[in-house]
Structure formats: structure tokens, C-alpha cells
UniProtKB/Swiss-Prot annotation:
<dbReference type="Pfam" id="PF01765">
    <property type="entry name" value="RRF"/>
</dbReference>
<dbReference type="GO" id="GO:0005737">
    <property type="term" value="C:cytoplasm"/>
</dbReference>
<comment type="function">
    <text>Responsible for the release of ribosomes from messenger RNA at the termination of protein biosynthesis. May increase the efficiency of translation by recycling ribosomes from one round of translation to another.</text>
</comment>
<dbReference type="InterPro" id="IPR002661">
    <property type="entry name" value="Ribosome_recyc_fac"/>
</dbReference>
<dbReference type="InterPro" id="IPR036191">
    <property type="entry name" value="RRF_sf"/>
</dbReference>
<dbReference type="GO" id="GO:0043023">
    <property type="term" value="F:ribosomal large subunit binding"/>
</dbReference>
<dbReference type="InterPro" id="IPR023584">
    <property type="entry name" value="Ribosome_recyc_fac_dom"/>
</dbReference>
<keyword id="KW-0648">Protein biosynthesis</keyword>
<dbReference type="GO" id="GO:0005829">
    <property type="term" value="C:cytosol"/>
</dbReference>
<protein>
    <recommendedName>
        <fullName>Ribosome-recycling factor</fullName>
    </recommendedName>
</protein>
<comment type="similarity">
    <text>Belongs to the RRF family.</text>
</comment>
<keyword id="KW-0963">Cytoplasm</keyword>
<dbReference type="GO" id="GO:0002184">
    <property type="term" value="P:cytoplasmic translational termination"/>
</dbReference>
<dbReference type="GO" id="GO:0006412">
    <property type="term" value="P:translation"/>
</dbReference>
Length: 185
């Protein structure tokens, strides 16, 4: 029973870490990354459709994304969706390909992005700590129902804390990498 609680806690902490990585990958650095356009929705037959379903996005070079639209009739809709997104991008089309040059980040914008990254990181840490709290509550419930002894409870809580410390450290590493990426480019 305790092993299942620990495994469940570790799995949930891993999911929290992956979610954090996903959120942070959408924050623009100076480098062109196709994931930057993942959140863009394009109006397609009256429905908002993810850009990824309508086009292929690749990094052409360090500062340019190339969006190859599958259906020529959608080029203007895709261009408009990129232009009206809050990413501050200015696309230009050439045939079925839309080129999206990424403007260089200003020092002020880099600092703002680092604040956003730190905020996301704090949310990631809170998620990991919430998983720890849930696991500890389950362990205490087992103690209350007299399914485990106090020694087993303390040992299990220590192991949960060790797992938590590992994931908090991983969150810090992800944040440090993203901050370095933002400041280096």
C-alpha cells in the first residue's frame, strides 16, 4: 500500500514537471522553435483549429520559422492568426510557405520573460508540494485506520520528502536552463 502511494506521488510529480516544461517551452527565446506557434488557433470552416493540424512548422534558421500550409486557401487565415497572436510576430507569405522572422529580444523583454518563467516555476513547485501533501494525507489515513505503524508512517513520509526534494531540484534545473537560454541569445 505504501509503495503504491509513493509510486503514485512520483508519477504525479513527473507529470507536473512535464507540464512545467511544456509551459516554459512556449515562452519565446531568441531562437526559432516550432513549439512557439503551438498555441495558435486558425479559423477553419467556422471552427478554431490548431495551426499544427493545418500546416507544418519548422525552424528555417536560428531566427526564422517556416510555416508550410497544407491548403493554399488557408494561407491568409494562417497569416492573420499569427499576426493577431500575442507573440508580436510579423509573418510574410511566399507561395504555400509563410516565413515568420523572430525579432531580437530587448533586454527589458528578456527580464519580463524571466519573471514569467520564475512564476511558472513557482507554480510547478506548488504542484509538486501539493502532490506531497496528498501522499502524506493518504499515509496519515492509513495510520488512522491502523493499517500501518507510526514508524512506517514516518519512514514513508521521509521517502515522500526525498522524492519531493528531487523534483523541486529538477524544477530549479529546468528554470535555470530556460533563464540561461533567455539571457544568452
Amino acid at each position: 500500500m505504501l509503495n503504491q502511494i509513493k509510486k503514485d506521488a512520483q508519477d504525479r510529480m513527473e507529470k507536473s514537471l512535464e507540464a512545467l516544461k511544456g509551459h516554459i517551452s512556449k515562452i519565446r527565446t531568441g531562437r526559432a522553435q516550432p513549439s512557439l506557434l503551438d498555441a495558435i488557433q486558425v479559423e477553419y470552416y467556422g471552427a478554431a483549429t490548431p495551426l499544427r493540424q493545418l500546416a507544418n512548422v519548422v525552424a528555417e534558421d536560428a531566427r526564422t520559422l517556416a510555416v508550410t500550409v497544407f491548403d493554399r486557401s488557408l494561407i491568409s487565415a494562417v497569416e492573420k492568426a499569427i499576426l493577431t497572436s500575442d507573440l508580436g510576430l510579423n509573418p510574410s507569405s511566399a507561395g504555400t510557405t509563410i516565413r515568420v522572422p523572430l525579432p531580437p529580444l530587448t533586454e527589458e523583454r528578456r527580464r519580463d520573460l524571466i519573471k514569467i518563467v520564475k512564476g511558472e516555476g513557482e507554480q510547478g513547485k506548488v504542484a509538486v508540494r501539493n502532490v506531497r501533501r496528498d501522499a502524506n494525507d493518504k499515509i496519515k489515513a492509513l495510520l488512522k485506520d491502523k493499517e500501518i505503524s507510526e514508524n512506517e508512517q514516518h519512514k514513508a513520509e521521509e521517502e515522500i520528502q526525498k522524492i519531493t526534494d528531487i523534483y523541486i531540484k529538477k524544477v530549479d534545473e529546468v528554470l535555470a536552463d530556460k533563464e540561461k537560454e533567455l539571457m544568452d541569445f
